[in-house]
Amino acid sequence: MAKEQTSYPVVDLFAGPGGLGEGFATALGERGEPRFESVVAIERDEFSHQTLLLRHFLRHFATDARPDDYYRYLRGEIDRNDLYRRHTAEFKKASASALKISLGPENHALVKRLIDQRIADCRRWALVGGPPCQAYSLVGRSRMMGQPGFEQDERHFLYLEYLKIIIDHQPPVFVMENVKGLLSAKIGGQPVINRIVSDLTSPKMAVGNEANGLGYKLYSLSEDERPGEEVDPRLFLVRAEDYGVPQARHRMFIVGIRNDLNVRPGRLRPHAPPTLRQTIGGLPAVRSSLSKGGDSLERWRDEIAQLASSDIARQLNGSQYTRDIVKGIELLKTQGGHGPRSSSSARYEADALAGHPALSYLRDKNLDVLTAHEARGHMPSDLRRYFYASVYADVTGRSPKLSDFPKSLLPAHQNVELGRTGKMFSDPFRVQLPDQVATPITSHLSKDGHYFIHYDPSQCRSLTVREAARLQTFPVNYS
């Protein structure tokens, strides 16, 4: 009698630092056993791969038996190479599953061989991940073939490579994740998403092979109806905040089930998300630093104190909230000595997370150090804008638009006036409101700091990497 399969192999393409794979890895059975095992995870970026490898390494230890060396590494007492040398067996296993490879024609044979080896004769496994969103800008292959350089475009290769991997290995199930923007993207006036649905339904036909044979039924995770080419593709959209995630992240998830299988996925169960305050409010308060001219607590306070309440009152010209905003600014300026003194903190208290059930798996009772909780440096002018914006949000319950700023605080950019009059983006300085979920966290946080202003005026800064990671539901020990 065949042995019952206790966990399902997962092949993770375009894995990044491992976020999607982490979700599968944390899915447990009735006895607490892992339901999925990542046997191949492929990522080409060096830094993302380092994070991916470390996480695969950690998964080879039981949750209640993680080595103290891992926590010593997080505390900076040993480096990553020391950690791996002390646990060579686990490192060897992780190195075999977390792979730094560029997907494409040059590595197609290698990737095919690796997946064949790891899947072997297993009949129940899943392919997860999806090509970077840029791949779909050239998805209309039949209409684009005449364009110079199309065949050499990497984006074209990435999308075709994804389809070829499906054809090569015929996974029973695939889960393709991608950006909401696919719903509005068009090539030659035709919706890109329609072509993608057609390609995923019949992958062989998509690459010019036979029109019959391998095929998939495509399902939504948020709706009962099975979408097809004639059904509104918006059914594939998953609004993360509807399912317990503390950010308004809207992503497309297409679940493909091979045609010969008589199964269908269930729907995600909606439940309320934790608020921003519940998710990051327990982290140590840290102040921003000054990016130019040297940083010190005294100079930082002096720069913020230059925000003149009288000027603000005059320029707001008696708006509804003027008195409360001015009062809030003056109160915080006089209490400046009681705010955070440092721009970083490694202190971690295991019970700092609020009691929301969606946050329970972020904890690690053995962790005593916090990584990546360091505020960015900002220009003095931005400090005052952040301070004003967070006070405004505290008083009004909303993030200010450009038209809500005193002119003395506005940057001297042409786009600012266009924003004030509604002709361009009107909210380049966006406060993350404490009693709501966060707006979507981007992968380039350092470039988009203005969009992620902390709600606490006394900290006067954008979100730290650790705060952003927590809002993306990475566990607190993810490094």
Residue ranges and their predicted role:
Residues A2-P9, A15, G19-H169, K180-N194, ...:
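Core alpha/beta nucleotide-donor-binding catalytic domains of modification enzymes
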Residues K3-T6, L13, D45, G189, ...:
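Active-site-proximal structural scaffolding
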Residues S7-V10, V39, R124, L235, ...:
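Extracellular structured ligand-interaction cores
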Residues R31-E33, L268-R269, H454-S458:
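Short aromatic-glycine motifs in intrinsically disordered, low-complexity regions
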Residues R118-A120, L138-P411:
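Class I S-adenosyl-L-methionine
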Residues P132-S142, P171, N259, S446-K447, ...:
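Short connector loops/turns at beta-strand edges and beta->alpha or beta->beta junctions
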Residues L367-S479:
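Polybasic, glycine- and aromatic-enriched phosphate-binding surface used to engage nucleic acids
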